[in-house]
Amino acid sequence: TDPVAERRDCLKGQFGIRIGSTNREATVWADVIVLAVKPQMLSAVLSELGPTLAHALVISIVAGVTIRTIVEQAGGATRVVRAMPNTPALVREGMTALAMGAGVSDDDAGLVRTIFETVGRVVAVEERLMDAVTGLSGSGPAYVFQAIEALADGGVMMGLPRQTAELLAAQTVFGSARLVLESGVHPAQLKDRVASPGGTTIAGLHQLEQRGFRA
């Protein structure tokens, strides 16, 4: 469902999916329901859906709303999973954290993992850690984008064309992240391999430390 008819029709045409004009209409036949609304809209949506959620596996990507809140407000939902994906999912390089509710079966958990693994990597965490996940991987892309922009700006300041500087910065971040993931080597060790004694890299790292990069 979508409140804008044109968007519903566009999704139907693009993916060949069933659409509905109301949330209740959509949930009647759905085995899996994804709650993807603003936190301030959730109460109204759950009130509308009510007992129709009882038969379905409910996946919530609503930031800051607990499983308990959803169960209490939904009036029947017992199989609830909280998920925190991030925007790199748009290019299938996302990171999603999942917190499983008490009523979620192993089959349910496997299905949810499969869904989110189509757009990146998945990790299961205790629900009490979801706020930390939100700050790290949920908001993390924004921090990385700013770092890429800063690296590129430095390159431009040194005379590189903007497009070249952005490519150098983005690919450096991408490759470095992949090296961490695939090598299994601690980032500190990888950093030390780049920093020669008395070289430019260690000088740059010193400046980052002096200016509160870790803070």
Q: Where do the model's predicted regions map?
A:
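Rossmann-like NAD(P)(H) cofactor-binding subdomain of soluble oxidoreductases
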Residues: F15, T22-L98, A102
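Internal alpha-helical scaffold of NAD(P)-dependent oxidoreductase catalytic cores
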Residues: T69-R79, M95-V133, V144-E182
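Short pre-catalytic strand/loop immediately N-terminal to key active-site residues, enriched for Gly-Thr
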Residues: V81, M130-G135, P187-D192
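Short acidic-hydrophobic, aromatic-tinged amphipathic segments that line or gate anion-handling sites
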Residues: R18-N23, V123-V125
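NAD(P)-binding Rossmann-fold cofactor-contacting core
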Residues: T1-K12
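Aromatic-residue-lined binding/catalytic grooves and analogous aromatic/hydrophobic interfacial grooves
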Residues: G140
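Small-residue helix-packing motif on alpha-helices
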Residues: R8, A26, P161-L168, L190, ...
